[in-house]
Amino acid sequence: MIIGLTGGIGSGKSAAADFFIDLGISVLDADQVAKEALSTNSPGYTDFISQFGEVYLNNNREVDRLKLRELIFSNPSKKKDLENIIHPIVRSAISNFIITSTSPYSIVMVPLIFETNSYKNYDKIITVDCDLELQIVRASSRDAQNKSQIKNIINKQASREERLSISDDVLINNSTLSDLKKQVNVLHTKYMELLNE
């Protein structure tokens, strides 16, 4: 069974994923794969320079992610160009992960699962959800961005309603990490029972 794990920025996806890992479940972070797709030793890096030019590199010749983020949020066609570089790399990594995973079920953490229509590729979808204000506070403190930047990112992502509409299971992360862990344990038990039917 392959499960997609999603949620908006600052919802607690990574915390939930870590709890599944603690239970022995294989988890792939598609966002991390996407970030690594533009690292200096990757094929995506070369494609990136060809497409975007060296103006989006910092002094260390690494992709200047802040500058790039500003570009793609203001220019939809550039966002599409970037996706055309990154998405094939991510899809390949997900395929390899699924083939090689040995845990009873596997989880792929995909923040933009609704936006990319990739939710159709999974047996189940888990959404980590939390109140909007909590989401903004968490994301702005973690990512060193101001609240208006975080709100802008949230407005560009799928709405809570859209994410929840494709979800089989929802983890409500409005409380403590301990509470989130309990919810993950309940889901894990449910999935193990499903697999043993």
From Swiss-Prot:
ATP binds at residues 10-15. One of its GO terms (cellular component) is cytoplasm. GO terms for molecular function: ATP binding; dephospho-CoA kinase activity. It is an enzyme of class 2 (transferase). Its EC number is 2.7.1.24. Its main location: cytoplasm. PROSITE patterns: DPCK. CDD domains: DPCK. Keywords: ATP-binding, Coenzyme A biosynthesis, Cytoplasm, Kinase, Nucleotide-binding, Transferase. It catalyses: 3'-dephospho-CoA + ATP = ADP + CoA + H(+). It comes from the Bacteria. Pfam families: CoaE. This is Dephospho-CoA kinase. Catalyzes the phosphorylation of the 3'-hydroxyl group of dephosphocoenzyme A to form coenzyme A. It comes from Gamma-proteobacterium EBAC31A08.
